[in-house]
Amino acid sequence: PAVNQNSSIKDVIVEITQKRLGLTAVLDENDTLKGVITDGDLRRMLEKGNDILNTTAKDIMGIHPKTIEGDALAVDALDRMRKNNITQLIVTEDKHYAGVIHLHDLIREGII
C-alpha cells in the first residue's frame, strides 16, 4: 500500500482499507519513501479534530518509518519487528518503496 504525499485523507483511508494491512507508505513523485500512515495515525487525527477536507498525507504521516532493505534476510526482519514491537516493516530498495513485509508473511513462510 502506498499513496503520494499530497494525497487526500479520503485516498489514504481507501488505500489502507483496500490493502488491509493497517498502514500505507507515503511517497514523493519519485517513489522515494517519505513516511508512513497507520490506522492509529488516522484515529489520532480525528480525535484532534483536524480539518479532514484540507489535510493531506504529508500532514499526518510519521516521518521515521521502520524499514528494511529488500535484500535483507527474513530473520533480520523478524528481529527488527521484535525490537520495535511492531508487526510490519516497509521494504525499500535504495530508499525507494518496494513493499511491506508483515509478521504473518514470516509465519506463512515458516520463519517462525
What role is predicted for each listed range?
Residues 21-25, 34-35:
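Conserved active-site beta-strand-loop modules that form the wall/rim of enzyme catalytic pockets
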